[in-house]
Amino acid sequence: MRRYHKMEKIGEGTYGVVYKAQNNHGEICALKKIRVEEEDEGIPSTAIREISLLKELHHPNIVWLRDVIHSEKCLTLVFEYLDQDLKKLLDACDGGLEPTTAKSFLYQILRGISYCHDHRILHRDLKPQNLLINREGVLKLADFGLARAFAIPVRSYTHEVVTLWYRAPDVLMGSKKYSTAVDIWSVGCIFAEMINGVPLFPGISEQDQLKRIFKILGTPSVDSWPQVVNLPAYNPDFSYYEKQSWSSIVPKLNESGIDLISRMLQLDPVQRISAKEALKHDYFKDLHRPPEFLNGVH
């Protein structure tokens, strides 16, 4: 760790403390120190293998993992540094983002996700806090792959409850078949939040989270979601709710935006649109794409 000089603590994430630091060449970076439970026997070798794979991810919309440093009791991930995240931006923008900004951010989120999904890596814990933004308006996804390496704890490093607001209904009901669709659900929730300025499903417990989802999307049935009855937490006596119209939920979205969000926020994961398909959606046809969007990875 002598190569890095800690400048300040910048956050406490799901897995540990994050510091702003400087390396010997004067470059600013972010150090994410992964805490290992005291009773654990050091860092699992599987985690180190998983994390090492993430160093191979190179994409303009993925936060670059520059280095991995591990000692017996601590794993430090060295990332490129970005000074803003989507949560801070949304907190500062009353009433949601400008439509063109929301569209640009959504496109970039989907590009990053599509790239990771192509590499068979899921995020599983997407939320505005781990979508980082630089001053040029480039958005990058942070913490990809960490859920598989370390499992998402119920409580974070600081003992805060890890948010359920962006978690898919299939996961909330105990599905262990994680697929790319879990990330698409999270993106749909973030899309609505960028437009409305407030979280779409701000639940306080798993039950409350499901109730909020069903109040908007309607209570699932075997007809609308055939596999729902096989989920561990499925309850045939869930309160019955009618599906609401998307135009009343996201009134500022145009017709193509409503079509896209409705394809993302499908209760049945099999019916959710893929990131690759979403990138081709009509909603983006008028998006001004900077050259790096068109050239792909650089």
From Swiss-Prot:
It catalyses: L-seryl-[protein] + ATP = O-phospho-L-seryl-[protein] + ADP + H(+); L-threonyl-[protein] + ATP = O-phospho-L-threonyl-[protein] + ADP + H(+); [DNA-directed RNA polymerase] + ATP = phospho-[DNA-directed RNA polymerase] + ADP + H(+). The keyword Magnesium applies. Its EC number is 2.7.11.22, 2.7.11.23. It is an enzyme of class 2 (transferase). The active site is at D125. ATP binds at I10, G11, E12, G13, T14, Y15, G16, V17, V18, K32. The modification Phosphothreonine is found at T14, T158. Keywords: ATP-binding, Cell cycle, Cell division, Cytoplasm, Kinase, Magnesium, Metal-binding, Mitosis, Nucleotide-binding, Phosphoprotein, Serine/threonine-protein kinase, Transferase. Its cofactor is Mg(2+). PROSITE patterns: PROTEIN_KINASE_ATP (PS00107), PROTEIN_KINASE_DOM (PS50011), PROTEIN_KINASE_ST (PS00108). Residues 4-284 form the Protein kinase domain. The keyword ATP-binding applies. One of its GO terms (cellular component) is cytoplasm. GO terms for molecular function: ATP binding; cyclin-dependent protein serine/threonine kinase activity; metal ion binding; protein serine kinase activity; RNA polymerase II CTD heptapeptide repeat kinase activity. It is found in: Cytoplasm. The modification Phosphotyrosine is found at Y15. GO terms for biological process: cell division. Phosphorylation at Thr-14 or Tyr-15 inactivates the enzyme, while phosphorylation at Thr-158 activates it. Serine/threonine-protein kinase. Involved in the control of the cell cycle. Required for entry into S-phase and mitosis. Probable component of the kinase complex that phosphorylates the repetitive C-terminus of RNA polymerase II. May form a complex composed of at least the catalytic subunit CRK2 and a cyclin. This is Cyclin-dependent kinase 2 homolog. The lineage of its organism: Eukaryota, Sar, Alveolata, Apicomplexa, Aconoidasida.
